[in-house]
Structure formats: structure tokens, C-alpha cells
């Protein structure tokens, strides 16, 4: 039976460390500031923005949310990004995704100064990530690596299989796992013989947003299973992994909720602090 990878516990420990780091920055006369641009009324986005704001306030990080109407023009969004790029008090900047259809998400993200790109989504920072020369990492991917480190799960030589190829989890996590000398495969909706491939995984990560799609017969005995999915079924939150049966086969497994989720916001705040330190020559 698998042991639990407790993201909540690690998030609490990290929160204490981050609070001390913010205090240290303020002793140098530096105050971290995160600006979030949220366009429209997507319910999930509003929940995530609110959770970030609560965490930022708790740590002493200033967060400013620019809540724009759903019919905002792309031109006006680009102008706002330009002004925030130019503001020396703004240490980090992100555009909450998804954006409304009249706005080209790629153009908007590319406009962000890479030095303030807290989500690590600009082409320059994606390139640095794959070169192993990054100074910022996407929060969820960074949180997963930290969780594995915390439980002393070595990736060297392991077969890591990631189900999901998003720019915010699957692809950057693959880059970070390659840095740790894992052999990485990325699977997706067009992958053939999915179960045959997932059963080869020493480390199996699922990040597709499809409730309980990973069944026990798709998992190798003794695998480490990381569930990034958050799905609501009959009023309850469940992951992408059929938790109870898979737990019987896994050596380690993340629960939903309480696994990867709590780490995402914590690591976003860590990225804010890292960018702030870098901009002020304190890294």
C-alpha cells in the first residue's frame, strides 16, 4: 500500500521559510510586488486569483489584481503590460489564463518582460528552462520536484511518464525531470496504447483534468504516482487518478485534495521572491 506524499505539510514548511525571506528583503528596503491581470469572469480563475491574494497578504507580498472586463481589447491589455514592465516597483507579472477569444494569449504572454515572468511562459524563459539555465520555473512543476525531493525520491535513471502536455505542467515538468537525469516520456490524448506506456513508469504524473482516468491496471507495482488533476464529481474533489485502488499498488501517491494543489500557490510566491531578489542583485 502506498504512502502519502503530503503536499499540505510541505506547503506549511515552505510558507514559514518564505515569510522569513520576505522579511529579509524588506530589511534591504525591497518589497516584492506581484501584479495579476485577470480578464473576464471565469469562475476557476477568480478562485485561483483570490487564493494567491490571500497567500501574498499572509507573506507580506503586495499583490495587485487588474480585473478587466471580458470584452477588453488586446491593445489595451498590451498597453497595461507595457506599463507594468516599465514600473520598477513591479517585481513580477502574470496574465491569468484562459483569456477571452478576442485576445491572442501568445501575443499577450510574449509581451511580458522575461525578468518579471513569474509563470515562466515567455519564449525566452521556456528556452532557458530547456537549456537548464533558468532563473524561474512554473509553480506546479517546481512544486512537484520539491515534493519528490522532500521525500528523497531520486529521479536518476528512472522512467518518468507524464500524461499531459500543457505549457504550465507537462512540458516544464519534463524539462525539470530531465535535469534530474530521469528518462522522460510525455503522453497525451493522441497517444496510442496509453496503458501499456503508463505501466512502464517508475514515476507516473497525470495532469489532464479527466476524473479518475488512471486505473490500477495502468500502474506498475511500486510506482510513484503524482496526481495533478482537480475535478469535481458529485460535489467532491477528485484527481485524475482512481485513488484507492491505485494506492494499493503505488509506493507513494499524492492525494486530491492535499497533494500537489497546496504547493502551487506557495511556489508561485517563491518565484515572486526569486525574481525580486534577482532584480535587486540579492540572488
Swiss-Prot record:
Give UniProt keywords alphabetically: Amino-acid biosynthesis, Histidine biosynthesis, Hydrolase, Methionine biosynthesis, Multifunctional enzyme, NADP, One-carbon metabolism, Oxidoreductase, Purine biosynthesis
Mind telling me what this protein is named? Bifunctional protein FolD
Pathway(s) this gene product operates in, as recorded in its UniProt entry: One-carbon metabolism; tetrahydrofolate interconversion
The record's Pfam families line, in alphabetical order, gives: THF_DHG_CYH, THF_DHG_CYH_C
Its biological purpose:
Catalyzes the oxidation of 5,10-methylenetetrahydrofolate to 5,10-methenyltetrahydrofolate and then the hydrolysis of 5,10-methenyltetrahydrofolate to 10-formyltetrahydrofolate.
Output the Gene Ontology cellular-component terms.
Answer: cytosol
Q: Which GO terms describe its molecular function?
A: methenyltetrahydrofolate cyclohydrolase activity; methylenetetrahydrofolate dehydrogenase (NADP+) activity
Give the EC number(s) under which this enzyme is classified: 1.5.1.5, 3.5.4.9
Q: Native species of this protein?
A: Lactobacillus delbrueckii subsp. bulgaricus (strain ATCC BAA-365 / Lb-18)
Catalytic reactions of this protein: (6R)-5,10-methylene-5,6,7,8-tetrahydrofolate + NADP(+) = (6R)-5,10-methenyltetrahydrofolate + NADPH; (6R)-5,10-methenyltetrahydrofolate + H2O = (6R)-10-formyltetrahydrofolate + H(+)
> Quick check: keyword Ligase in the entry?
no
Q: How does it assemble?
A: Homodimer.
The record's similarity note reads: Belongs to the tetrahydrofolate dehydrogenase/cyclohydrolase family.
Return one Gene Ontology term, BP aspect: tetrahydrofolate interconversion
| Chain sites annotated for binding NADP(+) | 164-166, 189, 230
